[in-house]
Amino acid sequence: MSVITRFAPSPTGFLHIGSARTALFNWLYAKHTGGKMLLRIEDTDRERSTETALKAIIDGLHWMGLSYDGDPISQFERAERHRQVAKQLVKDGKAYYCYASPEELAEMRENARAEGRPPRYDGRWRDRDISEAPKGVKPVIRIKAPQDGETVLHDRVQGDVRFPNKDLDDFIILRSDGSPTYMHAVVVDDHDMGVTHIIRGDDHLTNAARQTIIFNALGWDIPVMAHIPLIHGENGAKLSKRHGALGVDAYRIMGYLPAALRNYLVRLGWSHGDDELMSIESMIFWFDIDDINKSAARFDLKKLDAINGHYIRMNNDQDLFDAVLNILPEIEGGLEIIERLDEQRRAQFLAAIPNLKERSKTLRELIDNASFIFTKRPLLLDEKAQILLDKNGQAILNGLYLALKACLSWDAKTLDETLRVYAQKQDLKFGDVAQPLRAALTGRVTSPGVFDVLVLLGRDEALNRITDQLVTTAC
């Protein structure tokens, strides 16, 4: 049997980080088994479904490198097929028309509330003849659910999960306006698409029990089910925006790499020994749904940062630069940076990446660490840099300016010798000389090596930046 999985998002918002992990697990299992992953858009909620959300989902999948087989399938466009199956169930005696009025249903709910039990439809139209139907009332179609015993879900992650049938009631599969319910449409679509394995969040467990009833009523094979644990925040509570519940696109703009996000997400609920970092080829080779944990995974942003930092360090410099250029239009101040990145500064930025990426956990940090390249003159000094350029620092800087200006060659070796000779003559430690210089060149106390910065900026720009600070202080 060829494995067919499916990712079935609703186009009502962005590709949530939890949905991205579900897509990843489906994709990995399909690749691991040599099967396919299909994309179904569950767009039956016409009021909330938008083209913008659909585009965000597809773009998010593409950015993460999660390809799907064939064209996306619209659930809404299959509504006629859903209606046909529902009506066939009525003909087969597996479902029935229900004419209960809104008032009757409200009374059932009120009685259940008064008796302290969950609201359940009482089945009053289950065995009544259609000739008793009131005039002018459009019926719904309800499934004839088993009234005794239990429905058992054989789940590859959760094990056997049992649901008393008395708690499931005769739920609606077709509304009075002829539109299918989610519960019914999913079953028909999974069957028609040939889905063999359903991998989704464990918040769908009760849905799975009801869908099992529909599968059985239709005499269709039930796909293998694997309900994966949800992702919780670091505090163990439901994932919130504060603790990482953002869309994939938000993580892209925050400067995370798709390979890093894949690597992090695959470890949320699944593992392979002590392996933290793994290639996509290793993930595909190792991944199996039987190894998914039952307990909820906790989202740890610091761990994601650490993994992303690893991928940044391992990445090709040009690819990192291209990724930076890709997100610049979407970050605060990014358009200004683009305007300042002329050909020379682009070359300087690219040349600085080997050093900068060693200290950057995200692309945003990489941009920030490179800001000394494209910042406006005179540089605004941060608080620590201002302290370094006090009167004593200014005196050191003034002497350094003269020493550097006299350099016949502007290379790291010559500059190193110049600074060390100057420090020795002034009876200063090398750090006492390098720190004020770094502050004047970058506006900060941390940066790539001071010689790297001097060479990167070039003689004229470096000397001009030193002059800026001397003039600024003198004023």
Swiss-Prot record:
It comes from the Bacteria. One of its GO terms (biological process) is glutamyl-tRNA aminoacylation. It holds the Pfam family Anticodon_2. A motif ('KMSKS' region) lies at residues 238-242. It catalyses: tRNA(Glu) + L-glutamate + ATP = L-glutamyl-tRNA(Glu) + AMP + diphosphate. SUPFAM superfamilies: An anticodon-binding domain of class I aminoacyl-tRNA synthetases, Nucleotidylyl transferase. A motif ('HIGH' region) lies at residues 9-19. One of its GO terms (molecular function) is zinc ion binding. It is found in: Cytoplasm. InterPro entries: aa-tRNA-synth_I_cd-bd, aa-tRNA-synth_I_codon-bd_sub2, aa_tRNA-synth_I_cd-bd_sf, Glu-tRNA-ligase_bac/mito, Glu/Gln-tRNA-synth, Glu/Gln-tRNA-synth_Ib_cat-dom, GluQ/Sye, GluRS_core. The keyword Membrane does not apply. Keywords: Aminoacyl-tRNA synthetase, ATP-binding, Cytoplasm, Ligase, Nucleotide-binding, Protein biosynthesis. GO terms for cellular component: cytosol. It is an enzyme of class 6 (ligase). Its main location: cytoplasm. ATP binds at K241. Its EC number is 6.1.1.17. The keyword Cytoplasm applies. Monomer. Catalyzes the attachment of glutamate to tRNA(Glu) in a two-step reaction: glutamate is first activated by ATP to form Glu-AMP and then transferred to the acceptor end of tRNA(Glu). Belongs to the class-I aminoacyl-tRNA synthetase family. Glutamate--tRNA ligase type 1 subfamily. This is Glutamate--tRNA ligase 2. It comes from Bartonella quintana (strain Toulouse).
